[in-house]
Amino acid sequence: MLTDMEISRQANVRPIGWIADDFGLGKHLWREAGHAMAKISLEAARAPLRGKLVIVTAVTPTPHGEGKTVTTIGLTQGLHLLGHKACACIRQPSLGPVFGVKGGAAGGGYAQVVPMEVMNLHMTGDIHAVTSAHNLAAAAIDARLFHETRLGCESFSAKTGLPALNIDPERILWRRVVDHNDRSLRQIELGLGDNNGPVHGGGFDITAASELMAILALCENIADMRARIGRVILAMSRDGKPISADDLGVAGAMTAIMRDAIEPTLMQTLSGAPCLVHAGPFANIAHGNSSIIADRVALAHHDYVVTEGGFGSDMGFEKFCNIKSRASGIAPSAAVLVVTLRALKANSGVEGDDRARLEAGFANLHWHMQNVMGYGLPLVVAINRFPDDAMAELDWLKERCLEEGAFGCEISDAFSHGAEGARALATAVARACDAPVNFEYLYDDEMDFGARLMTLAERYGAAGVSLSEDARRDLAMITELGMDKLPLCMAKTPLSISHDPSLKGAPSGFELPVVGLRLSAGAGFITVLTGKVMTMPGLGLLPGYLNIDINDKGEIIGLG
């Protein structure tokens, strides 16, 4: 079989204007961003919603993923093949995983967004806009600290006419960001050298973990984005008051940098189905879903909209339900859970023959099935087939899924056969979308912080929760600010349902260690840091960039 790059290169990429016409967008609602991309006006999101939203999730993945994006794109192509008007909504890839271990995020095989190298490398620069806006705030808070320290607060106010913020250098909360995996930047010292400001600690996160990325994904329009950015808390004053981006006077400039990034980007799949690519928060350290705006645009113009939540259902799907859907008010009509035989065996935690490993690993799939169905959604299990999968094992898995209450279960060959390989899956999903839905959140808005945290922990299988001293201090600050009722965004390993990647299957009886809390007042949630999770990834022993180069024709090679 050809590589993803070779398949993408051989694709008949249609002019993006044709895709926009099929989408149903008048010329005033989009503008070209090159031959293969278009930016969509926010006006396109104002039409009444007509479509049904399908959320794609997965079992606990192996490090290379189980084909969730392949399934999302393949399912969209399959629905398109059946004559339905269908659109995919996915996140913009971060350069971190592209050059790290996982590779690109455009799908794969014959279920791709094309051109894949355009999607995986920069696209329309939205992530860079988020990076620039975020780091402008970081520069502004340090500059204000420098000048107030140099002049003294009274003299600063007299010279500038601005109120002194009296920033506490030990309580600057706003870390810098960059769109790469770089562990050396996790903890740094700022202000070193003569006349560079008071020395204080800091660090970098990956841009996908930026609160601005979450705001981009959760806002409804430009005014909402501006208001949310203004509420972002950058630091605390020496007398314990929060200092927001509006207080610093930088929120307007930050929004200006992100003005064009708020518009979703229209691309196409190999079969010519439309795909909206917008925002890129990670699911393990952020809320892990594409934008509300993209969903609204797609739902206003299509019968079916297929989106995905990052990693397993304990990660992106949970946040889709409790953060994104809560913010948008849009409930999904059905869910698709992607599983592979490889993932079941990897999640078994045992050695032995394949059947024994499958039996043990099924506990993980069973947990994810119960988790998804617990939100009141019809569930279709998609078995993503690999070339060496044994048919007897696939049949066994399909039968078990149906026995455990799945609305449907189909083998997907989208990777190898594109739309035709997802025909059966698309048929099952269309049927599921007509089934009764009783969608509900996992916790109520009025539950206190401890009750909401324990509800999530118990869903993971934990017997209890422990808060470190840092986490308790963070909670005291958040409570004092009156923001302890915000939804929770769990930051943890994606390689286990628990906080510990070594706990396979469906662990239970463990204690969930909370090591810190981060308030995202603009995005509207509290990030709960657990275990040894890092908000800045690192490159591995054999990173993906080793495979990437450019040939004499100027073509990128080795990507994917």
UniProtKB/Swiss-Prot annotation:
Pfam families: FTHFS. SUPFAM superfamilies: P-loop containing nucleoside triphosphate hydrolases. GO terms for molecular function: ATP binding; formate-tetrahydrofolate ligase activity. Signal peptide: none annotated. It catalyses: (6S)-5,6,7,8-tetrahydrofolate + formate + ATP = (6R)-10-formyltetrahydrofolate + ADP + phosphate. Its EC number is 6.3.4.3. Keywords: ATP-binding, Ligase, Nucleotide-binding, One-carbon metabolism. Disulfide bonds: none annotated. ATP binds at residues 62-69. GO terms for biological process: tetrahydrofolate interconversion. The keyword Nucleotide-binding applies. NCBIfam families: PRK13505.1, PRK13506.1. Belongs to the formate--tetrahydrofolate ligase family. This is Formate--tetrahydrofolate ligase. It comes from Shewanella amazonensis (strain ATCC BAA-1098 / SB2B).
